[in-house]
C-alpha cells in the first residue's frame, strides 16, 4: 500500500527548507550563526503573512527563522499556543500535482 502510494505521488527530492518560529529573530540569529556556524543569506519582510523571515542556507536546504510582526497572525497564534520551534518542513517533489497537496 505505501509503495503504491509513493510510486503514485513521485519522489521526494530533498528537504527544501525548515521553517522555525521564533519570538525574537535577532536573538535566534545569534544562536544559529554563532553556535551552529550558519551564515545569514537575507532577511525578508512579508507583510502579506505578517512575518519577518531570516534565511540561513545549510547545504542544499535552508533554515528559515520566522518571527511574527503582529499578534493576530497565524504564525503569532502558533507561537502563542506552541512556543518556539518547527513550524513547517517544505519538501521538494517531482510533481506537486500528484502529491494531492495542492490547494485551490
Language model features with spans:
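Core-facing hydrophobic residues within beta-strands of well-ordered domains
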Residues: 12-15, 86
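N-terminal amphipathic/basic-hydrophobic helices that include classical n-h-c signal peptides
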Residues: 1-8
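Vicinal oxygen chelate
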Residues: 22-26, 70, 81-104
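Hydrophobic side chains within alpha-helical segments
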Residues: 19-20, 67
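Short, flexible, solvent-exposed loop/turn segments with mixed acidic/basic and small polar residues
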Residues: 8-9, 76-82
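Intrinsic, low-complexity N-terminal interaction/targeting segments
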Residues: 64-77
Amino acid at each position: 500500500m505505501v509503495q503504491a502510494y509513493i510510486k503514485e505521488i513521485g519522489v521526494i527530492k530533498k528537504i527544501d527548507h525548515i521553517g522555525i518560529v521564533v519570538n525574537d529573530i535577532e536573538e535566534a540569529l545569534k544562536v544559529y550563526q554563532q553556535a551552529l556556524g550558519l551564515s545569514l543569506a537575507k532577511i525578508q519582510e512579508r507583510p502579506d503573512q505578517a512575518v519577518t523571515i531570516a534565511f540561513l542556507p545549510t547545504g542544499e536546504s535552508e533554515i528559515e527563522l520566522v518571527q511574527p510582526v503582529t499578534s493576530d497572525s497565524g504564525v503569532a497564534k502558533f507561537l502563542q499556543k506552541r512556543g518556539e520551534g518547527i513550524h513547517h518542513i517544505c519538501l521538494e517533489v517531482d510533481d506537486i500535482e500528484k502529491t494531492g497537496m495542492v490547494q485551490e
